[in-house]
Swiss-Prot record:
One of its GO terms (cellular component) is extracellular region. Disulfide bonds join C28-C49, C34-C54, C38-C56. Pfam families: Toxin_2. This is Potassium channel toxin alpha-KTx 1.16. Its main location: secreted. GO terms for molecular function: ion channel inhibitor activity; potassium channel regulator activity; toxin activity. Belongs to the short scorpion toxin superfamily. Potassium channel inhibitor family. Alpha-KTx 01 subfamily. The keyword Endoplasmic reticulum does not apply.
Length: 58
């Protein structure tokens, strides 16, 4: 029972925040290229390059 609870808790914690990501149309080849883009658009440099486009996390 404890293991089931811990697995469920871990799943919930890992899934938090994925829906908050904001996609942009800015092309990138590395995560460092997205930091100034995210800072300019959303006020925070939290982002990464995914599938050739910047994805920002508020």
């Amino acid at each position: 029972m404890k293991i089931s609870f811990l697995l469920l808790l871990a799943l919930v914690i890992c899934s938090i925040g994925w829906s908050e990501a904001q996609f942009t149309d800015v092309k990138c080849t590395g995560t460092k290229q997205c930091w100034p883009v995210c800072k300019k658009m959303f006020g925070r440099p939290n982002g990464k390059c995914m599938n050739g486009k910047c994805r920002c996390y508020p």
